[in-house]
Regions:
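Hydrophobic core segments of alpha-helical transmembrane domains in multi-pass membrane proteins
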Residues: 29-37, 76-86, 149-158
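A membrane-cytosol interface segment of integral membrane proteins
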Residues: 221-267
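Membrane-anchoring hydrophobic segments
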Residues: 1-72
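Conserved beta-hairpin
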Residues: 164-197
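N-terminal membrane-targeting/pre-transmembrane regions
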Residues: 1-8, 74-134
Length: 267
């Protein structure tokens, strides 16, 4: 039952999201804006849509939960918050992310979304929190007819959106990709350039054993990474961020490396 749900996970998320708006009775302008953005993106399976959903949906859930005490936990607000949280949990599963990134693949590509590095968890949350706070502030000032304040915060929100959304979207563009020629590590966050590993260069792929000495290209993340062993030394160019995390130079010659996809490519 659960596996069948995950196979068609896009539909349960859509149904839950529609149910949220059907049972709610307290949406403000900002909540409606976030709900509409996420709802529209849920029908467009693509990495851009995944970013839009994962940026907008948490705001709806956060507002629904924050309103529970003021509503004295009446049934309708509780149901609204519960549906929003369940939808949010599904949205952040590896299966849901995989549906979106694979739908944007070309030809015979098979994309595996990479896990977020631990070091980016706090900056990512803070970037989202800034956007959320600014949007809610614009909504509040508009409701109170404080037009000057609303305009000022609105300008700041527009600039922050332009700067931060692009950075957040990069997390949805990090993939391990199976292509006819081999594998590609497509990661503009941790690598200075994408890395193509041809099939004949690969000696083996397996879950990394404890104590492995392979270079970690995952940026340190949760879960067990995949270890790729190469036939000969191969150049890999690190981004300044990964160089700082690994405390190495920006160009390495490696025979073993680690990547951390959200779903195993070893099946």
């Amino acid at each position: 039952m659960i596996q069948r749900l995950l196979t068609h996970i896009a539909w349960p998320v859509r149904v839950l999201w529609i149910a949220v708006v059907l049972v709610q009775n307290t949406f403000t302008l900002s909540t409606w804006a976030m709900w509409i953005i996420a709802a529209f993106a849920m029908w467009i399976l693509h990495p851009i849509a995944l970013s839009a959903i994962r940026i907008a949906a948490p705001g709806v859930a956060a507002i629904a939960i924050s309103r529970l005490p003021n509503s004295h936990f009446e049934p309708i607000p509780v149901v609204t918050a519960t549906l929003a949280v369940i939808a949010l949990l599904l949205i952040y599963t590896s299966d849901y992310g995989s549906v979106h990134v694979q739908s944007g693949a070309y030809g015979n590509e098979r994309r595996y979304l990479l896990r977020m590095p631990v070091s980016l968890a706090l900056p990512t949350f803070l970037a989202w929190a800034v956007l959320f706070a600014l949007l809610v502030s614009v909504d509040y000032f508009t409701t109170e007819r404080l037009w000057l304040a609303a305009s000022g915060v609105g300008i700041v929100f527009a600039v922050a959106t332009w700067k931060l959304v692009r950075q957040l979207h990069r997390l949805s563009q990090r993939w391990l990709v199976k292509v006819p020629a081999g594998w590609v590590i497509h990661d503009g966050v941790l690598l200075a350039e994408n890395m193509l590993i041809r099939t004949h260069q690969i000696v083996g792929m397996k879950l990394a054993p404890a104590g492995t000495e392979a270079i970690d290209l995952s940026g340190i993340t949760r879960g067990v990474p995949v270890e790729i062993s190469l036939r000969e030394l191969t150049d890999v160019r690190l981004s300044p961020l990964l160089s700082k995390i690994t405390k190495t130079v920006d160009v390495l010659h490696v025979k073993q490396l680690l990547v951390a996809p959200t779903r195993t490519p070893l099946n």
